[in-house]
Amino acid sequence: MNKILFYISMERERHIEDLKKIASLSKNKKNVKTQKQRNLLGKNVITAIKGIGCRPEKVFYKPTTNFSVNGSLSNKKGLRKIGKGQMGEVFLGCVDKECKKPVAIKVSNDSNKYEYKIGKRIEKLSGTRMYAYQECDKYSIIYTEYANSGTLSSFIKNNISTLRPIHLRTIVTHVLFNLYRIHKKYPSFRHHDLHTENVLISTNVKSTGIRRFKIDDIVLKVHDIGIEASLNDFGFSSINGIPNPEIDSGDYKRKHGIYRESHYMYDVHYFLNSLRHFLKGEKILSGQETIQFIERVLPHDYLGMVTYKVSDFRLRTTPVGHEKLQTFNRIFKDRYFSPYREKTQELSKVLDIIGRAAPMKPKPIIVKHGGNPAPPKVSVSKKGYVKIGTRKCDSYKKDELVKIANILNVPTKNKTISKICQDLKLKYIK
């Protein structure tokens, strides 16, 4: 017992020290995006591709360098290939010349509308933002949010010299909590392919001090260090109400355990098991706490590439089930998350450096007392026709125009649309 308390204390102290070292960096990061800006980008994309969604190379600007996306200036239209998977190729394009609004573009030979629909359904629970879908003659395209730090694998490799246990703890906490939230709302959801290449990392997000994660009776106060992990690539995913031909065929059930009734902890197991394999294989020294955590919460029979419970790192289909697997509640009670349970005076000082989230400002309460709506504006265009608001008067349907005329106290009995418009002109245009 004393040994466990020692480890808890040691890991918590290391977490606070790491937090001190990165606190100022988190607060002073440049080019960060707020949630409002990220949502607005989706509207920009939809506007940009309107009518020409099958030709993204004609719409977006091509980043000029492989070393920096944000801030690169380009006058050349086109895309840059950034990845390739089993379901298609992924390209990068920019809405603007400065590439402050990058977009990921996935092109597949087959229709993947089911993938877009599944991703769209869970995006608010921290799936990748799905902007638009376009069905073309011989291929289909999904426009999604671009994660500036790439996949979890590339993020770890590219930051190996500065990576600390706090970074991995933050990412693991985000992924597990997001899966928990998704399962609470959509119990039938399975990602089925959640390895380190299908978790995307964004480091250009705004830090908000502390984020409160509630898992049943557990409350974690997670320190926001400006890193966000999201789920990506829903080609093998399933959720009630959306057919997926890739898994509904049954081709992946026996070998990979992929089918609609797979174990509800399938994604948690595959993510943790594949992450452990990656950290050990790449010899990531800062990953030791995470490796030890995974080996505590996953039974020995569920670790590695092949056991009688696991095939290719995935849960096997078995008639006896997987009763040894822990629930979300039990996993989040592990000491790995202890830095998020207690608030010390020292930790409070560090959070002051990061900056606490501003309290939510309540929206003004508008009390409706009835009465007539504000009268619309009547004007005459340069071409001489009558306008009501922003529309031509004669473009309104008869019943719509009668309601407007009644508000403006213009008689309408036995009058045509043309006559009502003329009367409005006579009354309001001097």
Residue spans for each PLM region:
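Juxta-kinase regulatory segment immediately upstream of eukaryotic protein kinase catalytic domains
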Residues: 15-79
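Helical subdomain adjoining the active site within ATP-dependent kinase catalytic cores
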Residues: 255-364
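Basic helix-extension-helix modules of the SAP/HeH family
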Residues: 371-372, 376-430
